[in-house]
Amino acid sequence: MKKAYLTVVSNREIADHIYEMTLKGDLVDSFQTAGQFLHIKVSESMTPLLRRPISIANIHAEKQEATIIYRAEGEGTKLLSQKRDGESIDVLGPLGNGYDPSVVQSGQTALLVGGGIGVPPLYELSKRLTKKGVIVKHVLGFQSKKDVFYEEKFQALGDTFIATVDGTYGAKGFVTNVIEENDLSFDVMLSCGPTPMLKALKDSYPDKPVYISMEERMGCGIGACFACVCHTDQHEKAYVKVCLDGPVFKAEEVALSC
């Protein structure tokens, strides 16, 4: 983990209020694991005070560039969406424990399931798994057609299924409906998205290895403030820190309350 300034290469809207930002700098050399995140200071002023945690969607190591994808909905991310090419951004990272690629072997099938803004980290993961010979399938869930992004990029790596809650694109319903209706088989599931989605996946496949990346509000991003604790399934008084111990966990390790 290091603190550094990265330069904005591009920052564009790719879906409704969804932005893709490419950053460049020496810090990218330390981005080695899919599923980690950056803690970004969105303004040089005192407000907003807290950094914003945003997952890494794509790493271009040879260019020292990395891409993040975020939803501009709050004060901080709206400020981030106004950043222009050439500006510098104060970044702390990479943070957290990402996905362990060794949990799925060459020739096996990995089912990657993402919901909304939980989709981005799965792209870098899919790239890495495909490179090692894993058969990758994707199920991506969104609220509506206007929210869909990166479909073609995922499709280039493996079979990709889209679900929208309102049925305006792809299958109508949730990611769990798509998995069941298409009878998608897999050896390992790796997912990222809202807690209700993660809980549904955990409950639906208790006998399968399911890995989840949790979305939690964070304060410090380094485990000091206890803002993102989550109880474990082993003991009601035991907990983990999502920013430090996660955000990726084996589903059976954490208690998911919706």
From Swiss-Prot:
Annotated positions binding [2Fe-2S] cluster: C220, C225, C228, C243
Molecular function terms from GO: 2 iron, 2 sulfur cluster binding; electron transfer activity; flavin adenine dinucleotide binding; metal ion binding; oxidoreductase activity
Oligomer status and interactors: Heterotetramer of 2 PyrK and 2 PyrD type B subunits.
Cofactor(s) required, per the database record: [2Fe-2S] cluster; FAD
Similarity remark: Belongs to the PyrK family.
Protein name: Dihydroorotate dehydrogenase B (NAD(+)), electron transfer subunit
Co-factor binding comment: Binds 1 [2Fe-2S] cluster per subunit.
Keywords: 2Fe-2S, Electron transport, FAD, Flavoprotein, Iron, Iron-sulfur, Metal-binding, Pyrimidine biosynthesis, Transport
Residues bound to FAD: R52, P53, I54, S55, I69, Y70, R71, G76, T77
CDD domains hit by this protein: DHOD_e_trans
Pathway note: Pyrimidine metabolism; UMP biosynthesis via de novo pathway; orotate from (S)-dihydroorotate (NAD(+) route): step 1/1
FAD-binding FR-type domain: residues covered: 1-101
Natural source organism: Bacillus pumilus (strain SAFR-032)
Purpose of the protein: Responsible for channeling the electrons from the oxidation of dihydroorotate from the FMN redox center in the PyrD type B subunit to the ultimate electron acceptor NAD(+).
Superkingdom of the organism of origin: Bacteria
GO terms of biological process kind: 'de novo' UMP biosynthetic process
